[in-house]
C-alpha cells in the first residue's frame, strides 16, 4: 500500500505538544504567547544540491534543518517554542522520512520545541522550516545595536564546515580524523541557543554566522551605522583547521566560509568579565576578535589586521544565495 501524506505526518511527526493550545491535526495551530513577551519568527529553506548533498544522511539532515533555524533565534536571544516543517519529496520514502524525523525531533525535544504543523508534497527534495520563539518585550538582541567602542566576539570555532566542504569537493586533502571533526560541524551544527539567552542584557548586537564571518559582520555594521576592526590572529580555529593555516583555503574558511552557525556579537568593554562568565556558564568558548569603531571617511568599513599590524584588503566574502 502506498504511503500517504497523512500517514507520514501521523507516523513520524505527531507528538505531544507542551506549549501549544492546538497542534498537528487541524487546519492550523493555536499558540499562546506569554504576557510581556514578543513573538520571534524566522524561516530557512534547504534545497538539495544547493545546501546539502542529495545523498546526505537523513538523520543528520533532520538535525541540521532545525538547527539552522534555532541558530536564528539564538542570535535574537529568544527562547525556542514552536516550529513548522514543509517537505517536498521525490517519493513517499517511509525509511528516509523515519530517519529524518529522528534527527529533527531529537533536537526539538532537546530544546523543548513543539512541531505544530507543516506540509508535504511531491517534488525535488526541499526542506523549509519556520521557527518561532519568545523574548521579553524590548530585550531581543538585534543587528542594529552595535556601538563604537564595543568589543567584537565570536562563539566556538570558525571555518570547520567550509573546510569540510572543500575536502569533500576534493579542493584540499585532510586526514580522516580531521575530516570527521570538520564534517560533524557541516552536517550537524550546534545552535548556540543557551549562549544567546545568556547574552541578553549584555550584548548590544548579535548575528548568527551562516554566510561567513565577513559577510555577516558586514550586515551588523551596515544596520548599526558603524565600522569595525578585527584581528586575524584572534580568530578561533579548531585543532583540525589550525594545522592548515599555512594554506590560503584555511583562511578563506575562517573569514568567509558559511555554515558555521556560531554567534558574532558586540558588547561594551566593561562587560568583558561577564561575557567570559556567561560563556563558561553555558560551556561555550567565546573569543574577543576585534572592536567596533565610528565610521571614518576614507577608511574601509571593515579592517582586518594581520599579526604584524598591517591592514589587509577585504574583498566581498561569505555566501551569497544569488551569486
Regions inferred by a protein language model and the residue ranges of each:
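Residue-level signal for inorganic ion chemistry
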Residues: 30, 69, 77, 115, ...
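Internal active-site segments that recognize and position negatively charged phosphoryl groups
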Residues: 151-156, 188-213, 217
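A short, charged helix-loop
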Residues: 171-190, 243
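Extreme N-terminal cap/leader segments of soluble proteins
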Residues: 1-60, 76, 81, 85, ...
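Glycine-rich anion-binding loops of enzyme active sites
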Residues: 33, 39, 46, 79-169, ...
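Glycine-/charge-enriched secondary-structure boundary and capping motifs
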Residues: 1-14, 57, 90-114, 121-125, ...
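Small-aliphatic-rich amphipathic alpha-helix that forms the alpha element of a beta-alpha
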Residues: 59-82, 99-110, 194, 198, ...
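General beta-strand structural signal in soluble alpha/beta enzymes
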Residues: 21-24, 40-42, 114-118, 153-156, ...
Amino acid at each position: 500500500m502506498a504511503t500517504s501524506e497523512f500517514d507520514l505526518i501521523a507516523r513520524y511527526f505527531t507528538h505531544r505538544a507542551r506549549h501549544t493550545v492546538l497542534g498537528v491535526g487541524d487546519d492550523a495551530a493555536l499558540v499562546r504567547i506569554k504576557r510581556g513577551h514578543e513573538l520571534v519568527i524566522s524561516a530557512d529553506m534547504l534545497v538539495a544540491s544547493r545546501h546539502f548533498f542529495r545523498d546526505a544522511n537523513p538523520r543528520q539532515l533532520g538535525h541540521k534543518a532545525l538547527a539552522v533555524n534555532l541558530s536564528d533565534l539564538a542570535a535574537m536571544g529568544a527562547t525556542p517554542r514552536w516550529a513548522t516543517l514543509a517537505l517536498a519529496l521525490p517519493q513517499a520514502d517511509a525509511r528516509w522520512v523515519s530517519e529524518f524525523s529522528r534527527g529533527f525531533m531529537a533536537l526539538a525535544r532537546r530544546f523543548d520545541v513543539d512541531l505544530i504543523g507543516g506540509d508535504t508534497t511531491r517534488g525535488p527534495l526541499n526542506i523549509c522550516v519556520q521557527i518561532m520563539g519568545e523574548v521579553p518585550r524590548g530585550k531581543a538582541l538585534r543587528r542594529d545595536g552595535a556601538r563604537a567602542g564595543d568589543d567584537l566576539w565570536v562563539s566556538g570555532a570558525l571555518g570547520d564546515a567550509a573546510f569540510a566542504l572543500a575536502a569533500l569537493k576534493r579542493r584540499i586533502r585532510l586526514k580522516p580524523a580531521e575530516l570527521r571533526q570538520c564534517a560533524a560541524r557541516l552536517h550537524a551544527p550546534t545552535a548556540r541557543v543557551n549562549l544567546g539567552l545568556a547574552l541578553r542584557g549584555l550584548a548590544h548586537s548579535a548575528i548568527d554566522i551562516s554566510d561567513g564571518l565577513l559577510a555577516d559582520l558586514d550586515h551588523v555594521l551596515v544596520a548599526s551605522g558603524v565600522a569595525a576592526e578585527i584581528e586575524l590572529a584572534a580568530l578561533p580555529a579548531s585543532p583540525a583547521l589550525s594545522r592548515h593555516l599555512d594554506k590560503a583555503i584555511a583562511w578563506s574558511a575562517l573569514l568567509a566560509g558559511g555554515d558555521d552557525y556560531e554567534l558574532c556579537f558586540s558588547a561594551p568593554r566593561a562587560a568583558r568579565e561577564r561575557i567570559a562568565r556567561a560563556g563558561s556558564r553555558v560551556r561555550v568558548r567565546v573569543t574577543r576578535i576585534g572592536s567596533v569603531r565610528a565610521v571614518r571617511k576614507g577608511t574601509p568599513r571593515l579592517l582586518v589586521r594581520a599579526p604584524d599590524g598591517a591592514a589587509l584588503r577585504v574583498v566581498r566574502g561569505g555566501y551569497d544565495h544569488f551569486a
